[in-house]
A protein has these predicted regions:
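Tight coil/turn sites that cap or link beta-strands
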Residues: 21, 63-64, 70-73
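Terminal connector regions
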Residues: 84-106
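Short, surface-exposed beta-strand/strand-loop-strand elements in extracellular ectodomains
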Residues: 40-64, 100-102
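Short, surface-exposed beta-edge/turn micro-motifs
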Residues: 31-34, 44, 84-85
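Beta-strand-rich, repetitive solenoid scaffolds
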Residues: 37-38, 48-50, 68-69, 78
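Surface-exposed ligand/attachment interfaces on beta-rich extracellular proteins
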Residues: 5-30
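Beta-sandwich interaction modules
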Residues: 26, 69-84
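Asparagine-centered strand-capping/turn motif at beta-strand->loop junctions
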Residues: 36-41, 91
Length: 106
């Protein structure tokens, strides 16, 4: 991710407990200006960019979407590649809860 200046104001850091069934890590936010996450777990995760209204269910699938490597894999949305709908995360460690750290700006 590098050093990114968030000149439009940041939000408080957040963390999400991601399950092997999938967890929503961002809601639809039309005013989103920045969103970044880091996989702080020992297991790879996958992000699904999901459009609200496409069935109303979690669409994250292990092995598909945006890959986040274990122990620090990261992804960033900014003014170049912004996405405004829901974001889901999933991993394949059966029965385990893994941590995803998030920073957002509005």
């Amino acid at each position: 991710m590098g050093n990114t200046l968030i000149s439009h104001g940041g939000g408080a850091p957040e963390g999400y407990n991601v399950t092997d069934a999938g967890t929503r890590v961002a809601t639809k936010q039309v005013l989103r200006k920045y969103w970044a996450c880091t996989n702080s777990s020992d297991t790879p995760m996958y992000l699904a960019l999901w459009q609200v209204g496409e069935g109303g269910v979690n669409t994250s699938v292990v092995g598909e979407g945006i890959y986040l490597a274990a122990n620090g894999g990261s992804f960033e949305l900014n003014n170049v590649n912004m996405y405004y709908d829901e974001i889901w995360a999933i991993h394949d460690s059966a029965g385990a809860v893994k941590r995803l750290c998030v920073q957002k700006g509005q």
